[in-house]
Amino acid sequence: MKKILLLFVCLAANLLPGRAQMMPDSTVQVVAYWKLGDKQYYRYESTQFKIKQQDTVVAKRSAGIISMEVISADEEKGYRLKVSTLESQESDPIAEALNEQIAKNFGAEDCYIDTDPYGTIQQFSIPEGLGECQEDLIKMVSDALKQKYPDENPDIFLPFLRQMITPENLVAMATNLYSPLFMFHGARLALSEKYEFEDNVPSIFTDGTMKMSGYFWVNEEATDEESVLLQLTKTADKEELKPFLFNNLNAIIQNMAKDMDQETLTSDLEKLYDTAKMSITDQIVEVVHLDTGWPIEYLFRRDVEMVISDEAGGQITQTTFSIIPQEVEQ
């Protein structure tokens, strides 16, 4: 049970037009100034580290190149971006198989992003028809799980996969990956202030949310007339994690372990949880080009820490996006 609890904490830890400029009143505003047909290319890398006691090892890694193309531009309504994966490498065979299956049937398009005139994200959508092949995707991932875990009964994964691979969750995964790149668009920030905020992180298993609190600010020393460097940090403590974690674990157990003693599982979980120490911390550092509003560099890091019965563990996830230099100027 300790392994299940630690694993889930890590999973849960995994959703007006004009040129932006430095203002004369010591503020900075991030605004999209995109034109129809504009296209930027980004190199991305994501690495997940597992921590057990004092040991840290690479659990999985992904990398590739994506493009973001403006396919609709309206000064009053906003913009639509098409996000496409041009190259992709996955160390996880299941993720690789899923990506290959989606690319085979739907091409390179990952999702579409609709924004307001400032570049503030309004909604995400996935390629038409992707949600209709849910059962095919579930079967493909189930087959990959059979190969990776030959000693396990593959049917135990099916309820979990049916919860995970849905049109809503495919949109949520795209939202979690790409929305932070544009989270500061539309904001006008003073150079000398830190802004406090609260964020309610939704669950994909229940209707619950997890509250995280933190602050963001402009790094004045690294900001000039060409670009702005923005930073954010947010955390969730044990009391904020408790209802979120417990409700989600119960949902997973009820779906994946129907033949097991539910009362005993719940009792064991409560005992472990009462003594557990846990925390989640997110950090974001982003550089945005002021003249166009395109992100130049982006770093996301999530630290998950867990101590159960003196056994320490956790996970670090680090994701970066870097604009390909020769494509910065349109």
Predicted regions and their residues:
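Bacterial Sec-dependent N-terminal signal peptides
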Residues: 1-26
